[in-house]
């Protein structure tokens, strides 16, 4: 029996992707003036259909890797301390993957297939620790992950001027599955999920983040994040990072002005 994903996204209503990768359309799917399937009579959604096909493959691969990864995360939390939160969202949905793949392909000037290969958080976890134990627990967990055979890359966003605070760890398991693990304090997690979340969602949708509005949104996130107390003991841990850069959207604007898009 086919595994089917039917989309509720406005651009994909009425489209079902089967296990074979075929796209099936319902008669309710909007068409343009020439009878092509599209969004409200607009452009043909070929790129988004291709993104949906790749998203399904990414999701199925992630689904196979997730049980073992989740067991490992529970073992690490039990062994080293820290609390796993947000486990209901450990698998990114097909619809979310579709949007991310399509958006990344467009803004980074890469193929849809390449954008899909670069997805690093189809399986993702968050561990929350007490500030006094945060650094020691993050270091212990990452070293334990290395000893278990994971490829580990640590990005330390606890930097002055960052619009986001936390430690993000990019993992690759023995099968090649990419996994993300974020380390937060209760304070930084609340900032990410509540205070800064609506601002970031607005910011990331901007075509040009250098506009006064974009700069204002980023300044709000930086100011909010500056209020968070930095846990001790993080010096030298991971690669220092300042916020989640969206500067490539400036390249998109330039490319459009030159007639490339």
List the predicted regions and their residue ranges.
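Low-complexity, glycine/serine/proline-rich disordered segments
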Residues: 1-54, 239, 252-261
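Short linear motifs in intrinsically disordered/low-complexity regions
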Residues: 3, 10-12, 33-34, 44, ...
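Generic structural motif
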Residues: 3-5, 84-87, 152-154
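Generic detector of ordered secondary-structure context
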Residues: 27-33, 61, 119, 173
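Short linear motifs at secondary-structure transitions and domain/linker junctions
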Residues: 30, 92-105, 142-148, 157-159
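Charge-rich, low-complexity segments
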Residues: 43-119, 135, 139, 194, ...
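Long beta-strand-rich cores associated with HINT superfamily self-processing modules
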Residues: 110-259
């Amino acid at each position: 029996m086919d595994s089917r994903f039917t989309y509720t996204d406005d651009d994909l209503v009425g489209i079902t992707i089967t296990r074979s990768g075929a796209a099936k359309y319902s008669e309710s799917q909007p068409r343009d003036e020439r009878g092509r399937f599209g969004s409200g009579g607009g452009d043909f959604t070929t790129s988004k259909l291709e993104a949906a096909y790749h998203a399904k493959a990414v999701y199925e691969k992630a689904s196979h890797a997730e049980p073992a990864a989740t067991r490992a995360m529970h073992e690490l939390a039990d062994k080293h301390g820290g609390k796993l939160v947000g486990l209901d969202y450990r698998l990114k949905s097909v619809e979310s993957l579709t949007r991310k793949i399509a958006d990344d392909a467009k803004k980074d000037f890469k193929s849809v297939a390449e954008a899909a290969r670069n997805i690093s958080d189809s399986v993702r976890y968050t561990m929350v620790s007490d500030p006094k134990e945060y650094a020691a627990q993050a270091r212990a967990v990452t070293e334990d992950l290395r000893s278990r055979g994971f490829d580990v890359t640590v990005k330390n966003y606890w930097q002055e001027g960052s619009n986001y605070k936390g430690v993000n760890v990019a993992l690759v398991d023995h099968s090649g599955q990419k996994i993300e693990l974020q380390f937060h304090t209760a304070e930084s997690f609340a900032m990410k999920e509540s205070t800064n979340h609506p601002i970031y969602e607005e910011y990331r949708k901007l075509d040009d983040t250098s506009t006064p509005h974009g700069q204002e949104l980023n300044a709000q996130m930086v100011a909010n994040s500056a209020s968070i107390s930095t846990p001790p003991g993080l010096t030298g841990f991971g690669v220092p990072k300042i916020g989640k850069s969206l500067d490539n959207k400036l390249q998109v604007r330039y490319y459009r002005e030159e007639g490339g898009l």
